[in-house]
Amino acid sequence: MSTNNTIKTPYEDLLRTILEQGSHKDDRTGTGTTSLFGQQMRFDLTEAFPLITTKKVYWKGVIGELLWFLQGSSNVRWLQKRNIHIWDEWASEEGELGPVYGVQWRSWPTPDGQHVDQIAQALDILKNNPDSRRNIVSAWNVADLNNMALPPCHLLFQLYVADGKLSCQLYQRSADMFLGVPFNIASYSALTHMLAQQAGLKVGEFIWTGGDCHIYDNHREQVLTQLSREPRPYPQLTLRKASSIFDYDFDDFTIEGYDPHPAIRGEVAV
């Protein structure tokens, strides 16, 4: 891993670009947004771990949600037992969300009544056919969308291996830039580390591609506060190897050198 921890600010740069160039749009939640379409950020995982520093990111929630996805679960009870409540607004009284991310990742239904474990399949491709251009995991199951509490925002990622390094590109159709995107950057960067470790690879880049990249009207002041802060160096992630991609736990992830500015609260647009 490189120790060249030059301060880079692709996330903050995109926030500024949206404020400067975005169009004001109405949205499903009735909140209103400033929106820009088709943007990209790149993060070199060989240098550092992209945990945003201009506000504190809820790291426990990042890892908890990722581990929950990897379980293939559709129920928030596992998260709630660990005092993680990021999905509560969308869950039924029984804690159900329908066939959301984890279900699609681990148990995509096929026409013959079988299921595809996309994560296991992706890892197998990394090990046995790393040059494949078909190593894609999708949560956007059109037949299941109406049964989901919330259709997937970060809906598809592709894995790419070159020179023994694993890179991941995410496509996010709807990007809540203030609340959601810092979380998503950290989550998929962590997943890239996990997959690389299990496949015997090093990490490369995490590339984030967004469709409707928006700042909600009720987050505008928070974003301006965030942009007034001086970015600090990204931390480093140390990952203890688990017996499989599905057996990681909170204690396997150690973040070192994370010195963020204080958290900034914002309401979720439901």
UniProtKB/Swiss-Prot annotation:
Q: What class of enzyme is it?
A: transferase
What Enzyme Commission number(s) apply to this enzyme? 2.1.1.45
Q: Give the catalysed reaction(s), semicolon-separated.
A: dUMP + (6R)-5,10-methylene-5,6,7,8-tetrahydrofolate = 7,8-dihydrofolate + dTMP
- Residues reported in the UniProt entry to bind (6R)-5,10-methylene-5,6,7,8-tetrahydrofolate: 176, 269
Instruction: Cite the Pfam families for this sequence.
Output: Thymidylat_synt
* Signal peptide residues on this chain, from the entry's feature table: none
Look up the domain of life of the source.
Answer: Bacteria
Q: Which residues does dUMP bind?
A: 28, 133-134, 173-176, 184, 214-216
- Keyword Methyltransferase included in the entry's annotation: yes
Which compartment or compartments is the protein found in? Cytoplasm
According to its record, what are the GO cellular component terms? cytosol
Q: Does the keyword Cytoplasm apply?
A: yes
Q: Known InterPro entries for this protein?
A: Thymidate_synth/dCMP_Mease, Thymidate_synth/dCMP_Mease_dom, Thymidate_synth/dCMP_Mease_sf, Thymidylate_synthase, Thymidylate_synthase_AS
User: Which pathway does the record list?
Assistant: Pyrimidine metabolism; dTTP biosynthesis
MF-aspect GO terms: thymidylate synthase activity
Keywords assigned by UniProt, alphabetized: Cytoplasm, Methyltransferase, Nucleotide biosynthesis, Transferase
A Gene Ontology biological process noted in the UniProt record is:
dTTP biosynthetic process
**Location of the active site:** 153
Q: What family, per the record?
A: Belongs to the thymidylate synthase family. Bacterial-type ThyA subfamily.
| Function of the protein | Catalyzes the reductive methylation of 2'-deoxyuridine-5'-monophosphate (dUMP) to 2'-deoxythymidine-5'-monophosphate (dTMP) while utilizing 5,10-methylenetetrahydrofolate (mTHF) as the methyl donor and reductant in the reaction, yielding dihydrofolate (DHF) as a by-product. This enzymatic reaction provides an intracellular de novo source of dTMP, an essential precursor for DNA biosynthesis.
Q: Which HAMAP family match?
A: Thymidy_synth_bact (MF_00008)
How is the subunit organization of this protein annotated in UniProt?
Homodimer.
Question: What is this protein's record name?
Answer: Thymidylate synthase
Q: Which organism is it from?
A: Corynebacterium diphtheriae (strain ATCC 700971 / NCTC 13129 / Biotype gravis)
